Amino acid sequence: PDEAPEARFVKAPEMGRQDRTEISWSISDDYGVSALELRITLQTPNPAAPDEADHVAVPLSGAAPTSAEDITQLDLTRHRWAGMPVTLRLVATDGAGQTGLSEPVDFKLPEKLFLDPIARVAQEVRVTVLREPRDYAELAKNEDALRQDALNVTASNRLGTAPPDIQKAALMLDAMTYKGERYIRDQGVYLTFRTAKGILDAAATKDEAEQVDPLLWALALRAEYGSAADALRRLEAARRALEQALRDGASEDEIKQRMEA
């Protein structure tokens, strides 16, 4: 019979360079492993979602290797649970859909340290939204919903159907921008916060509310690092392109093209 694939940590995950988490792993399967993921769960789960788990892809070298061992550097500082104690497990999947899990390992996800007040607020609002596991309540049905004024009322009441932490994030943004044009010197910062507030006001689902994620993350980086944040993002994109090219066995010319893209 075809056995489930095996996955294990070669050694405990640890902090690597530039805030990356270093994962040393080993996998094996008679017919090849088609995918490898890192499963992340909270050590102290949210009572509203006790079984909540996130999965982060771990790149494999080659197609469906029957045996492999490698060290992968993952940037988990943007993860919604950054800075929190979690439990990590490797999940290997073979072509038949069978999965094999490694032993669990306790770990504290690294977080990016923000010192700038604007950056800290942006990050706090961001994770408050992302860590909310509860869904939106359904809007009450309105017999006159076809009337435009009824539609407007419904839209304005959307935030009232949001789960508690998303409502809290909206209040934080309101407090941050109350007469903010007087004391927030950078107009772009003020407008970004107001845009994020508008997104939360209009959202009717968790996915829509989470659209504030890239907006507030970019704002936090820019507030903390200034124009260097753009350079850091370009450098990180180049690093990822190089790693992928090496995994794909690209030629020197192909590597150069990917790095210049």
Label each residue range with its predicted role.
Residues 1-261:
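Extracytoplasmic/secretory ectodomains and luminal regions
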